Amino acid sequence: MSFSNVLIMRQPDEGKCHICKRVFCCGKCRQKHQFKAHAIAVREPLGLRSAGGGIIEHRHQMESGATTIYVFCPICERRPLLLREEMHGELLAHIETCHLPLRCRKCQRNYTRVDDLREFSKCVDQQQSCTDVTGATETSKATLKKAANSTAISTQTSPSVTPISLINMRWKAKSRVTHEEFISDSVSSIRNLSSFSNSSIRRSIGQLGVNPSETMEKGKVIRSTSTPLHVESVFAKPKEPITFNASTGGHVSSIYHEEPSPTPESNPVQQQQQQQQPLQQRAWKMGARNKMSAATPLRQVMSKSIQKAFVEHGGMMVHQPPSAVVQRRVRLDLSEHSSHEAAGSSALDLRLSPAMRRTQSESSASEVNSGSSSSYSTSRNADLCKRQFLLSAQKLTTESIIITRTNSSSQKTSSTVYNSCESVEIIRSTSESAEVCHVPAITPIRVTGAGINKKQIKFETPPKSSQQMRSNGEGDETKDQFFTPEPGTPEIPERRHRQAIVPRQLSGEFSPKKDKPKEKGLAVMALISPPLQQPRVRPPLRECRQQRVYSGVQDVGEPEVVDAEEEDEVFRPTNASTCNDKKLEAPNSGRLWSLMSSMMRLPASLRGEREKDRDRDRDSDKENAGSGSLIRRCASIAGSLVRPSARDSSMEDQQCLKRKRTQTLDSQYCSPLSPSSSSKRYRIRPREPIERMRRQ
């Protein structure tokens, strides 16, 4: 900040010109500047007071000794011009030259001539006189901005009263009254009016409109504050129906809204008690709504389950009798003598889920009287029978789910009715045919058309005795019933559909010496004969060491006679699609390709022996002559593809040691159309150069 700016800030207002805002060194220099540049010399003084008119006459004594009267234009000084009957001619000439046209702030009248300023009339706005005129011209720099069309009072007529816009005040007060009538008991609304009642608001509005002078003395300013004022806790207010407006749906009722009674007629004794009940209310009940709203406001954050509970719990207000409107209030007195007076149900408890309500009502009783209207009017025993409608927050169904449970306790009978829709006719039709019946506790009934709740689905595991009976063949009629199996129950062999795994070995040189012609015969029979449909039991792993070891998946054959002790272990692939494809393919083509792939995988040392065994089996099998020719043709093709190579014993031992690493239980399934990866490695094995030159 520079030094010159500091000097300007420290200078008082007496060094600044009031019109052009120029700054001078002192007040005398500023006064000389104003009288020389901005003052209007007046010939005849009018004797106007400075407090009354706003135009101040300044007497300036010249150096020659003569006294001159000067007047400053209020418009140039950015002050309102008050029109009077007597005005200086020099001032009017200055206004005509510099400031015309003018517009009144109150009545928005335009003054375009000086004669209009002389022959003016009082502008009347809401019975208040206004003679303020401001300038709005573009030729002068000292003109004021055009005032907006507002109703604000320009000047403060009294130091004790704040200027208030009367129209805005009326509109705000009227809107508050209308708003209070509609949502007076809303859960999410809090009144911010500081007035004591609606009548005081209307009285203050009337006083403001009729006589403003009396309003300044007697009327009270209505204002809204940011702090909630609980006026109703001190002063009693009339009872009003409770509504709930903090939801998106139109059918949502209040928490304390009660179910309408299905019987339109009521006991006359109860009507008399209901008429006397408002007189017996205590004074502290008046502030019940404010206390409850402070506890749970329940705005727009309600879950869908709570909204459904509101829809099920509260009915429409149209179906209620006039006597039930008085009952829709906040009941803070929950004593026993006043609870049975109401014809509806108790308040909905949102803390309990439907499962908890069913658990708590295990020991409750059900009694539905067929002549409900006659019993209400004739006997007083209906007061002892309290009907509680516990409404579940489940999905709405097309029918009514009514579950009755019976229990007698202290000569009082209460019924629990689970009602999922507002169907009074179904309840009436059920109540006419139903009597007091003792039924054991049951699970909620599955109604046609109702959505299944995930929490209601219950899986049960059958006992072991039923499983043993089913295994013996006694439970054939219940095969379609499925249950969740127990983890400790042993599995039944007939239900096992798991396919086993084939122990794979590349060659049969390291397998134990067995009857190889018999093995080859079984392999050929498995390729020709159709496969068996019955799955077999997998033996324990300890017995696998005593079984045969085969060179490939396709070389394994299944015997025709199945014996649990003597049959060879064959592990099938676990993929169901491959099993189905294997069954659906043609017998000759599938066997042909499987035989070709098996022959291509066989080592060269066993090829000649396998050809002899296949020729011997072909002679012994007369009915399968066609397939035998295919086998012989396939063997010739495989012999042309797999070329024998002369190896010494050292090379064979080294190859055997290398092949031992691939002996494993492989769970993957090899397609018969493509050879395995191990056979590919054997075929692409490089040959010695001397053998290659000899064959070429």
From Swiss-Prot:
Keywords, comma-separated and alphabetical: Cell cycle, Cell division, Cytoplasm, Mitosis, Nucleus, Phosphoprotein
| Segments carrying motif Nuclear localization signal | 512-520, 534-538
| Residue numbers spanned by region Disordered | 245-285, 336-379, 457-492, 555-586, 603-696
Q: Where in the cell is it found?
A: Nucleus envelope; Nucleus, Nucleoplasm; Cytoplasm
Ranges of Acidic residues compositional bias? 557-569
Coiled-coil region(s): none
Which coarse location class describes where this protein primarily resides? nucleus
Which biological processes are named by the entry's GO terms?
cell division; chromatin organization; chromosome condensation; DNA replication; mitotic cell cycle; nucleus organization; pronuclear fusion
* Biased composition, class Basic and acidic residues, residue ranges: 607-624, 685-696
Chain positions found as Phosphothreonine: 478, 484, 489
- Quote a single Gene Ontology cellular component term: cytoplasm
Compositional bias per record (Low complexity), positions renumbered to this chain: 270-281, 361-379
Q: Where is this region: Rich in charged AA?
A: 448-696
| Further remark | The OPA repeat-containing and the Ser/Thr-rich regions might be involved in protein-protein interactions with the major protein-rich layer of the nuclear envelope.
Known role: Cell cycle-dependent nuclear envelope component required for embryonic mitosis.
Query: What's the protein called, per UniProt?
Result: Mitosis initiation protein fs(1)Ya
What gene is this protein a product of? fs(1)Ya
